[in-house]
Amino acid sequence: MGIVQMGAPRDLILQLQYAFGYRSFIETGTFQGDTALWAGQRFDNVWTIEAQEAIYQAARRRWPDGNIHWTLGDTRSALPKVLDQLDSDAIFWLDAHWSGGDTFGEAAQDECPLLDELAMIRSDARDHVILIEGARLFLSPPQRPHRIASWPTITQVIDALRTASNPYIVVHDDVIIAVPQKAKNLVARYCQEANTHAWMARCARQNARPSESLPRRLAGMLRLTGQDKAAA
């Protein structure tokens, strides 16, 4: 699977919000705050959780007031408090797993809190939308210097998503998508349209590209011509 896009699937999030009236957006892993700022302009309430204080402080300065609840701390301790404040189903964007550099994870030897996050969300009585960044990291062992033992397999992730619920689950554009059954058709159509567009673009590029076998055929013909002349 190639990495088609990085970051939250904003078009899909907006479609889900419009169709089902989601008013709250929760993000784990704030980083520079771009996703939180985007969501803050579209949702009534946004929570974003960041464990690294320097990253948290830098992001918070971009929008210190308003409907974004900037939260410093480990998602394991912060998520239950967020869930207590929700009054309806919400959209979760889970991106707190370590992605290298200065982001949280390596120093604490805590690269991926995903299974704990899913257990907390699934313990809630509501039926939330869950979007997980970096599907490639679970479909196959992540690249070095990540520790393989710190990362759950895709099977473990799917089993956790199915706890106390029966979501529709797909992987699209490096994102694991788990939605309530009421949103199945919307997500399926979204993925099919995106896949169709990508396939047509690929076909168009191939049709516009000169045949790769033509230079080889010409070289072969020249060699044969040279051999014929030598034989004569």
Question: What is each stretch, according to the model?
Answer:
Residues M1-I91, H97-A232:
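A short alpha-helical cap/connector motif
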